[in-house]
Amino acid sequence: MDSRKILSKIAYYYIAFTKSTLRVRSIDLVGRFKEQSVYALWHGEQILPLCLNSGRQIVAMCSMSKDGEIQAGVLKDFDFIAVRGSSSKRAERALIETIRYARKGHFVAFTVDGPRGPIHKVKSGLLLVSQKIGIRLIPISAIAKNSLTFKKAWDKFKVPLPFSKTVAVYGNPIVIGKDDNLEEKALTVEKELNKLSEFANKYYWSKDINEYLSHHPKPKIFIKCKNNINACIDKINELKQKYPLSVFTLYISDKENKNISLPQNVSVINKITSKLKEEVFDVCYGTSFIDNIRIKPNFKLTI
C-alpha cells in the first residue's frame, strides 16, 4: 500500500477514535442542517468541524499536494466528497466541480484561509459557490480543550486529544447576494470566524461569567421570578443592555408567587412582554419547574 494511503488510514482511525471519546457541546444559532449551506472554517481548526459533521456527503476541497492527498483519503472515509484543487493548481476546475455538486443539493465546506495562508485571511474566490448558487454561508469553529498545536505550522494546526471537552460553535448565516462585493464579504466572514474562534479557544472555558457572556455569540439567560415580576423585568432590561445578543427565559412559578394572580392566558403574557424593550425571550408559567424549561441556559438567576 502507498505510504500516503497508510498515513491517511492512520489519521482516519485516530480521528474516528478521538471523535467517539469527545464530550461535545454544540452552540448552533440557526440549525445548521435546516437548509443547504456552505460551511466556512479555518484551516488550522478543520479536524473537528469536519469530523463532527461527517456522514452527510458534504463536498470539501483538498489541495493537489501530498498532504492534500492524505486529507482527501480521510475525508472520503468520513463520507465526504473530496474535490482536488488549490489556489495555484486546478483552482477553476475545482470550483466548477464544487458548484456542480452544490447545484445538486450537496452541502459544501471550505477552509477559507487554505491551503497555504496567510493564516485567518479569507480568500474571496471561495465565496463564489455561495454567491453563484444563492445558498447561505455558515462560519464554524470547533475546539477541544485538550489539543496538540503545531506552533511552527503556518496555520497553527490543531489535533484534538481523546476524551477532551469540546465546543462546536455554528455562527449566524451570511448571505452573499449576486451584486455583493466579494472582497467586502470576505472581510465580514473573516470577522465572524475570528469572533467564533476566539470564543471557542478562550472565552468558552473562562470561569469569569461576565467574560463568558460578553463573548458568547448568543447567550441564553434563565431568570426565575420568586417575588417581584417588575423587578425581574427591570433586571432583564439591565442585562439586555449589558449583553445585547442574549436570549432570555423568564420563569414565573405560581407556587412561589402565591401573592400574584396570573391566569394562564395570552393577555398576561402580552402584558409582561409589553414592559420589556426586546421580545426575544420565552415566558414560562406554571407549577412544574422542569416541564417549563424550554432551553438549556448558559446562566441562571433567581430574583
Model-based region annotation:
Residues M1-Y13, F17, S54, I96-P217:
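Non-catalytic C-terminal accessory region of glycerolipid acyltransferases
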Residues K5-S26, C62-R100, K258-S267:
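Membrane-interfacial amphipathic helices and adjacent loop/beta segments
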Residues Y14-Q36, H43-L48:
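A short, well-structured juxtamembrane/interface segment
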Residues Q36-K89, I133, L148-T149:
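Catalytic core of membrane glycerolipid acyltransferases/transacylases, capturing the structured
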Residues V59-M64, F248-D254:
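Short internal beta-strands
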Residues L128, C284-K296:
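An aromatic- and histidine-rich active-site surface loop
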Residues I223-D234:
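A short, glycine/small-residue-rich beta-strand->loop->alpha-helix junction that serves as a flexible
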Residues K296-I303:
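Active-site proximal beta-strand in glycosyltransferases
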